Amino acid sequence: MYNRLRSMSFSCSAMDSAGPNISLELLPLELREVYQSWRRSSATPDNYSDDVQECDWPVSIYVPERYEEGYAYPLLTWFHSDANDEDQLEDVMNAVSSQNYVGLALRGNTELGKPGGYRWDPATFAQGSVGLSELMHLTTCRLRRAFHVHSERIFVAGSGHGADAALHLFSRHPDWFAGAILLDPFCEPGTLPAEGPGGLDRKSVLVSLSRTCALDNLGRCVAAVRTLRTAGASVDVRMTELPVDPVSPEARSLDYWMMECIQREQEGGICR
C-alpha cells in the first residue's frame, strides 16, 4: 500500500490487496458468475485507478495493544479536528477505549499556516485528483484484510471540520457504516448531498453541539439534523457547555454510545 502509515505493530505489506480472498472453486456455481463480474467491475477496490491505488495520502492505524486474532473488532474511522493531523488518532483511541476498537485516520486535505497542522476543507473532500470516498473505501478494505474487523460495526466520527468530512462520507455511503459521531460539526454547505441523503433508515447518529457555537453554525446544524431525521436516521443530539475535546476523559462516552449501538444491533433495534 502506498499510503504513508504510522501505526502500532503494523506491516504495510499486510494491506497490499483490497479484495476478499475467495477461492472461486469453493463458491456455489450460482455465485461464481456474480463474483467474477464483481471482480471485473470498476467498483472493486483493486480496480480503482492508479491515482487512487498509489495515493500518498498519510494514514494512521490504531491497533489495541492486546489485539486478539479471533475477535471481530469494531472499526472507528476518525477525521481529526482542525490544526491537527492523523496522529491525533492514538490520543482519541486512548480516550475513547484503548482496547475495544481498531482505529483508522487520514490527514486533512488542507495545510494550515498558523497555528500549524491540517484541517478538512469542506469545499472539496479530495486530495488532488483522488476523492475521499474512493480512498476511504480502498483503505478500509485493505485494513480488513490485515485485521479482523466486523463489517457491520464500522463507525465514522470526527470533530469540527472533521465532523463535516465524516457527515459527508456517511450521508453518501450509509451502507458502509453502523453509525456516525459528529462532535461540534460546522455543517458547511455541500456537506450533505444536494438531493438529500438516502438509505439512512434506522441508522444511528450522535451529534454534540456546544452552547457557545455561533448562531449561524447552530442554525446549519439544526437544519442538518432535521434532514437526517427526515431521511430516517435516529439522531441523538447532546448539548454541551463547551466543545467536546475528543482526547479528554469525556470522550469515553463515545465508547458507551457505540457499545449501545452494537448491543441494539444484536437485538435488532437502533441506538438512541
What are these regions, as identified by a protein language model?
Residues 1-73, 101, 223-235, 256, ...:
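A domain-start/cap signature at the N-terminus of enzymes
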Residues 38, 51, 55-67, 74-148:
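Serine-hydrolase catalytic machinery in alpha/beta-hydrolase-like enzymes
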Residues 59, 103, 150, 154, ...:
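Hydrophobic anchor at the start of a short beta-strand
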Residues 73-74, 99-102, 151-153, 175-179, ...:
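Loop/turn elements at helix/coil->beta-strand transitions in domains of secreted/extracellular proteins
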